[in-house]
């Protein structure tokens, strides 16, 4: 069983300072659609600010019970996997309750580091509940990465340019780990 947590704090800003980023509607919609397509159990939007969580809840509410459900039922269905939470600890707690065991925590980063887990290695070991942790802004702060069990290798295309949006990275990660393909 796979979970995704989209963490908004603590993350880096473009200057390398620790910050809190804002929740965006694009991230919510696109990551929910990818999560539902690939059978992710839950997508957690993790944000410490009550006001930012209210924004996310309002967006979700429009699609769950508001006019959005009738206007675009597929979008409404995709968003059903999404939960808003104040901390990564609460997301982990919820996933643990659902599965009966703490998920393997997998940090993501765009930086290559020694000891990272490859997509192939992780794909072969998805027999335990697993939580992929995505960072917004310019990536997860060390305090989040350090508490994870594994760090996933970066996504690289054929060029040296490596600056994907978090929602594009999330979709690629879902496909590489859960997609139907012959290996």
Q: For each predicted feature, which ranges?
A:
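RNA substrate-binding interface of SAM-dependent RNA methyltransferases
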Residues: 1-110, 171-182
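Secondary-structure boundary/capping motif
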Residues: 52-55, 114-115, 140, 161-162
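Structured adenosyl-cofactor binding patch, chiefly the S-adenosyl-L-methionine
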Residues: 138-183
């Amino acid at each position: 069983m796979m979970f995704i947590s989209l963490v908004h704090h603590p993350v880096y800003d473009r200057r390398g300072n620790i910050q809190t980023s804002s929740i965006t509607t694009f991230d919510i919609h696109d990551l929910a659609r990818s999560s539902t397509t690939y059978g992710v159990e839950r997508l957690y939007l993790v944000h410490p600010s009550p006001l930012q969580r209210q924004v996310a809840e309002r967006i979700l509410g429009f699609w769950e019970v508001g006019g959005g459900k009738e206007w675009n039922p597929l979008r409404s269905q995709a968003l059903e996997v999404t939960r808003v939470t104040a901390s990564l600890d609460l997301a982990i707690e919820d996933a643990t309750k659902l599965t009966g065991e703490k998920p393997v925590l997998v940090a993501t980063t765009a930086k290559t580091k020694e000891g990272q887990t490859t997509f192939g290695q992780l794909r072969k070991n998805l027999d335990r509940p697993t939580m992929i942790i995505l960072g917004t802004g310019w990536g997860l702060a060390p305090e989040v990465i350090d508490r994870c069990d594994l760090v996933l290798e970066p996504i690289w295309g054929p060029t040296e340019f490596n600056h994907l949006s978090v929602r594009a990275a999330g979709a690629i990660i879902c496909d590489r780990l859960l997609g139907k393909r012959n290996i």
